[in-house]
């Protein structure tokens, strides 16, 4: 199947959700998603392999936050997020991995999470309003235990990393696996 077979606009609509793609002849796409107070977007390129549609967003996956400060101070592990809009600070999930075991904690109203654990190999951060590939805050080579991070403007974009789309026919594209939309049975229909 050639790329031109999916050229045009495809939409998914469900109660409170509107989403769509615009695929162009030159292998580029634009995407939007609106759900309640959350708006997301993406742009990039696409390829078609058989009945599989592969998207490559301009957004780099796993880079939703920037570490602005890190240090070794006291005990436990503290991650502080900063952003002018306090509403977005309380929806960040941090995953602390120690010896293969995970502990997940949400940030408080001020964008902070603290865990009293003696050792942590890896820390990941994921914004639950804008889910995408988690950002690595700390790896096993980093001995720091206090981190300050800023939310990047690209947070609202979708990377589409590891997302599989199947071309059902000339008018339907189905999202097989999904981490970025609060919906199931996602089928984009050509308009």
Report residues per predicted region.
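Lipid interaction determinants
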Residues: 1-191
């Amino acid at each position: 199947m050639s790329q031109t077979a999916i050229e045009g606009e495809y939409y998914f609509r469900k109660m409170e959700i509107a989403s769509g793609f615009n695929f162009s002849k030159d292998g580029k796409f634009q995407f939007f998603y609106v759900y309640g107070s959350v708006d997301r977007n993406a742009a990039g390129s696409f390829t078609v392999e058989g009945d599989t549609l592969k998207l490559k967003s301009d957004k780099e996956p796993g880079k939703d936050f920037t570490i602005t400060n890190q240090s070794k101070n006291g005990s436990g592990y503290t991650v502080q997020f900063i952003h002018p809009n306090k509403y977005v600070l309380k929806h960040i999930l941090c995953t602390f991995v120690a010896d293969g075991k995970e502990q997940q904690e949400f940030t408080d109203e001020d964008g902070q999470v603290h865990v009293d654990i003696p050792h942590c190999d890896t820390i990941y951060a994921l914004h639950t309003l804008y889910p995408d590939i988690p950002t690595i805050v700390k790896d096993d080579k980093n001995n720091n235990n206090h981190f300050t991070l800023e939310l990047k403007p690209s947070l609202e974009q979708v990377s589409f990393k590891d997302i599989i789309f199947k071309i059902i026919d000339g008018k339907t594209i189905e999202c097989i696996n999904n981490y970025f939309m609060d919906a199931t049975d996602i089928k984009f229909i050509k308009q």
